[in-house]
């Protein structure tokens, strides 16, 4: 099993993505793959995995740290790269969709899935209401606990605050991916799960 050697909120929720990988997965895509840790973990479950990221620094890190058979890294903007339609069994993104047009990214991810393929997203949204802020309160002690027992470190990937609220993310996801399952998680993250008809 690939171990991270570090902890942060994104690494914490990688199991949510990994548990969404369909049995017998042949091809998987990690959108905005960063340092490639999730790509390496996906390669334990899929015959072939592609990681794409537009940051040359992150792709260089991914290639240096995660190079192995069955893994391909592409340095490009996901929304511009000409992947073939319906070419993946599994497409995922871990806390990266707020760096791009959210609806365009979900639409592109869905287009790349084969019928029956699975989509999984871990995302970040903005607290824009009292309800959002109250829902985030339990995350504070939980975050302190995790930081005390794990070695927290960022991957070096660019960081950006989200624009969309939790409600806006949920509404846009439901409109773009009918039947999508949305869930808000403890440490300031949400997940989306969807199977292409």
Language model regions located:
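Conserved Class I S-adenosyl-L-methionine
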Residues: 159-197
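A conserved beta-strand element that flanks and buttresses the S-adenosyl-L-methionine
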Residues: 92
């Amino acid at each position: 099993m690939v171990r991270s050697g570090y902890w942060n909120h994104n690494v914490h929720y990688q199991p949510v993505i990994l548990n969404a990988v369909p049995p017998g997965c042949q091809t998987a895509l990690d959108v905005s793959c960063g340092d490639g840790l999730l790509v390496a973990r996906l390669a334990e479950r899929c015959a072939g995995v592609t990681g794409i990221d537009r940051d040359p620094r992150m792709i260089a890190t991914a290639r240096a740290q995660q190079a192995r058979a069955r893994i391909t890294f592409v340095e490009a903007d996901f929304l511009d790269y000409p992947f073939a339609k319906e070419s993946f069994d599994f497409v995922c993104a871990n806390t990266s969709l707020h760096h791009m047009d959210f609806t365009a990214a979900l639409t592109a991810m869905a287009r790349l899935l084969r019928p029956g393929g699975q989509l999984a997203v871990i995302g970040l949204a903005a607290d824009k209401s009292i309800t959002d802020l109250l829902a985030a309160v339990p995350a504070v002690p939980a975050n302190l606990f995790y930081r005390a027992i794990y070695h927290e470190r960022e991957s070096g990937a660019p960081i950006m605050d989200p624009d969309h609220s939790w409600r806006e993310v949920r509404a846009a996801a439901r409109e773009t991916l009918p039947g999508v399952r949305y869930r808000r998680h403890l440490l300031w993250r949400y997940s989306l799960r969807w199977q292409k008809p």
